[in-house]
């Protein structure tokens, strides 16, 4: 099964005119596992309900709805979906919906926490409180796993949504999570690149110096993966650029599976370029809590939400 979503963006010569197509591979892998209980915070709007509906029809999840019951039922009615057999918990407002949803997952009632129609800061604040039961001691790090219909090989970007200016410690955690994600997907030895604007360390470019530090640390501390940095984006993506610039022997250059970025601006720009310009499909997930957290954008198509659910399901069973 391939999930297609019409691209309704206003046309520009630089925007992809192709439909967004999410890879069926994640869904096929996820369907091998027991269906998780997915708690949808503030569920009563079109896109989160459509994603929950399609994931339920695909036999991927058991949904638990939190939010305005009238709105939830109205959206279900629009989909001709009988949700009477599923749990729906009444909650007024974004903050209360986020709090209840987080606690359901923190105390074992839900396996995956999914953001519905509410602001990201409100949603994440609820997950960070001690009362939520979600904290594990690990840092919360976001990853986008992006696929393209012309290439079966995904690429991961971290962090493009949560950590604005991540410290070295946070980027080390992001590196660990990136490797864990690819191992869960069956990739025995992923290749991880540390992004900068150059392949040569420059004293006035902090990201290049950090990339050296991170590459040395990861090579020494993390098994079953290859690391390289600093690498500019062309050297991360293009084997021809790697050849021309004398890095053809670098195991990561031109063939990276994951990109660890120095800040949210660069990560977000790359992620949105791959989605809006290249027509990629992004599965987004926050790791580091007791359960996977799906921090999807309110404008994300249902197909991207389903891809995120599938990725989270795989990770809960790793």
Language-model features and meaning:
Residues 2-252, 257-318:
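Anion-binding alpha/beta catalytic cores of soluble intermediary-metabolism enzymes, centered on
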């Amino acid at each position: 099964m391939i999930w297609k979503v019409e691209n309704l963006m206003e046309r520009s010569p630089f925007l992809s005119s192709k439909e967004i197509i999410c890879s069926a591979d994640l869904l096929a892998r996820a369907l091998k596992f027991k269906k998780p209980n997915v708690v949808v915070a503030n569920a009563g709007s079109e896109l989160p309900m459509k994603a929950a509906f399609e994931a339920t029809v695909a036999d991927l999840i058991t949904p638990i709805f939190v939010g305005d019951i009238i709105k939830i039922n109205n959206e279900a009615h629009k989909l001709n979906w009988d949700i009477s057999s599923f749990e729906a918990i009444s909650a007024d407002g974004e903050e209360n919906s986020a709090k209840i949803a987080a606690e359901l997952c923190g105390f074992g009632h839900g396996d995956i926490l999914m953001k519905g129609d509410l602001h990201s800061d409100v949603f994440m604040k609820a997950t960070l409180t001690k009362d939520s039961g979600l904290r594990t001691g690990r840092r919360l790090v976001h990853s986008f796993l992006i696929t393209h219909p012309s290439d079966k090989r995904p690429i991961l970007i971290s962090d493009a949504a949560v950590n604005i200016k991540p410290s070295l410690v946070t980027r080390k955690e992001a590196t660990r999570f990136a490797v864990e994600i690819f191992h869960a997907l069956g990739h025995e030895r992923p290749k991880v690149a540390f992004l900068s604007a150059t392949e040569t360390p420059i004293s006035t470019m902090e990201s290049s110096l950090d990339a050296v530090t991170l590459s040395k640390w990861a090579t020494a501390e993390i098994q079953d993966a290859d690391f390289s940095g600093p690498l500019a984006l062309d050297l991360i993506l293009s084997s021809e650029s790697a050849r021309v610039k004398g890095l053809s022997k670098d195991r990561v250059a031109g063939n990276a599976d994951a990109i660890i970025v120095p800040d949210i601006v660069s990560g977000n720009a790359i992620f949105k370029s791959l989605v809006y310009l290249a027509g990629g499909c992004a599965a987004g997930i926050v790791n580091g809590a007791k359960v996977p957290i799906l921090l999807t954008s309110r404008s994300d198509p249902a197909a991207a939400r389903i891809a995120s659910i599938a990725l989270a399901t795989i990770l809960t069973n790793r």
